[in-house]
Amino acid sequence: MFKHILFPTDGAMTSKHIISECIGFAKDAGAIVTALHVMPRYSRAYDEEGAQAFRRECVSAAEEFLEEINTVARDAGVPCNPLHATSDYPYDAILRIAEEKHCDLIVMASHGRKGVKGMLINSETQKVLTHTKLPVLVFR
């Protein structure tokens, strides 16, 4: 049914717990996974040295998050393409990458919490749900 899953992550603990869920779903579907981490742009207010240091730190963190997903996928025998992008609007980058990579499903974390906050959905997840034409599977 699904052949190419986009799995965007911000590396937060709330999205880390769904890595195995996403990879398991992909394995059952016989799908490949594109793991995506969207990094913020660095502000022009930084000096050039600060901007470069910020970018290096963001890339390093992205590669760490993506390697964790890639390791779980490799261990499960699921093809995984790690990718990072830069955007001030993560949902926009998610939609763009989903289209560019011809993904047919987006899997995201709800970032739900306990109590009233648990009933709310992450704003980036909500924006993806609102603006995409693709199916979105949201894990809690």
List PLM regions with ranges:
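Gly/Ser-rich helix-loop-strand patches that form or flank binding pockets
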Residues: 24, 96-140
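Hydrophobic anchor at the start of a short beta-strand
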Residues: 33, 80-82, 136
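Small/aliphatic-rich secondary-structure junction motif
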Residues: 3-49, 72-76
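A short acidic, glycine-rich active-site loop
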Residues: 52-64
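Structural beta-alpha unit
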Residues: 71-106
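Short glycine-rich, flexible loops that bind phosphorylated cofactors or substrates
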Residues: 14, 90, 114-116
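Structural motif
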Residues: 36, 83-85, 139
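Short, well-ordered secondary-structure micro-motifs
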Residues: 18, 45-48, 92-95, 118-120
